[in-house]
Amino acid sequence: MKGIAGLALALAVAALLMAGSASAQIRPHRAEYTLRLGTALNATRIGTIVQDIELTCDGWRIRRALSVDASLTPSFKVSFTSRLEGDEARGKAFTWRAVQVLNGAEREVKGTVKKKDGTWQVERTTPDGPAPSVLSSFTHMPVGALDWLLRRLAGGSESFPLLAFVPEAEGGAFLLEVKRTAAGAADTPPPSQRRVEVPAKQSWPFSIAVTRAGRTDGKPPDAKPIVTLRGRLYDSGIMDGLVADAGVITVAAHLRDLKMREAPTCPAAN
């Protein structure tokens, strides 16, 4: 189960990188990725991940759906789904509902995150009861994390840390150690999958080591990365591929469908 937990975390963190824009406003869109076990061109398909980012007049609405059905060994089969619905009020607050189902066992978590007294106050409702926590004021909410990542890459930063809130991962904060690399990963889709063109003028290959920075279980931060990510991010805020290495499991995600969404026409602020 440790491998599956790592895989779920890897994909949740990876999804944070699948939207945003450094040179303009974040462009809303719906992106669908095919997940394959390993990086070989003939790697077995094990699922999909879909992220839908919608801009509203009040902020951002995020819908994320992950589905994995895989046989990791002849005797170990896994069925895992994760659904997230979240609303972010332009960095001021975040409200979400997440439902995960592992081999038929369902777990639902709801929560809100708000700035108070110089910190992020997290209120979570789990099947085990309320689970409040406090996160550093430097923690970025999902869309805010996207914006910060892209601004730093576009600005020429070679390496930098990023604290990001991942609502699916027990409502905790994660430290992303970002490095610009010489080449991206998962640039070549399998022969059976058509290549989807990403609207952009620039792109940045990167690698990210992920550790848990704000645990909610009282344990110290992780000493080693629990997930590493490799990919290429375009200035339109979209990735065409990503490799997530969770130790015992490596998953490659390839973009298979992309739809750009229109921004709403909102009344001017008073």
Go through each PLM region and give its residues.
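Bacterial N-terminal signal peptides
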Residues: 8-19
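Mature, soluble, non-transmembrane domains
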Residues: 97-270
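Hydrophobic/aromatic-rich structural module bridging two neighboring secondary-structure elements via a short loop
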Residues: 64-116
